[in-house]
Each structure stands twice: as C-alpha cells, then as structure tokens.
C-alpha cells in the first residue's frame, strides 16, 4: 500500500485526523521523549522491564511529534497501532532495513 493510499484509508476509517502542523506541540513531545530515553537508560540496570516501557514511550512520543509536523494526529481507540502504522508507511523500505 502506498503512503497516499494509507492516508486516504486511515482518514476514511477515522483512525487519523488532519490538523494544522504544530511545531510547538511537536517540540514538547520531542523534549519529553529525550527525558524518557534518559530515564530508560538510568533504569536499565535497575529494572529492565521499566526501561523498555519508558523507551517505548519515547518512540511513541517521537513518532507522534513527526505526525504533528506532517499535519496529522491519531484518533479513535487504536492510537498506538496507528502511530506505528503511520511511520511504517511513511518510512517504507527504510524501516524494514
């Protein structure tokens, strides 16, 4: 599926919504993701499970920031999956490598 088709389908299904690109909100998410990564690293030797959970949150926040910059946001009850799908379809082949 092409990126364009993915966007069309997810908008039609109500999984994505268009919005004005938001640099300020994206920046806040990136700064929070940086803190999350620092926290994950600090906790790795203490509790590996927590470290991975916090690292996952960093990935999610970073990807949501990217979506905001592209003029989209996830909606409905599948937000985590929608964010991952968005990045997969945007990055395409590069993500697989």
In which residue ranges do the predicted regions lie?
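Terminal alpha-helical segments
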Residues: 1-97
């Amino acid at each position: 599926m092409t990126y364009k088709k993915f966007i069309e389908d997810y908008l039609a299904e109500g999984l994505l919504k268009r919005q004005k690109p938001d640099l300020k909100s994206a920046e806040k998410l990136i700064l929070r993701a940086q803190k999350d990564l620092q926290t994950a690293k600090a906790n790795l030797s203490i509790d590996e499970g927590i470290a991975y959970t916090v690292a996952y949150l960093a990935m999610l926040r970073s990807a949501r920031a990217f979506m905001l910059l592209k003029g989209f946001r996830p909606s409905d009850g599948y937000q985590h999956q929608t964010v991952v799908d968005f990045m997969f379809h945007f990055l395409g082949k590069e993500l697989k490598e």
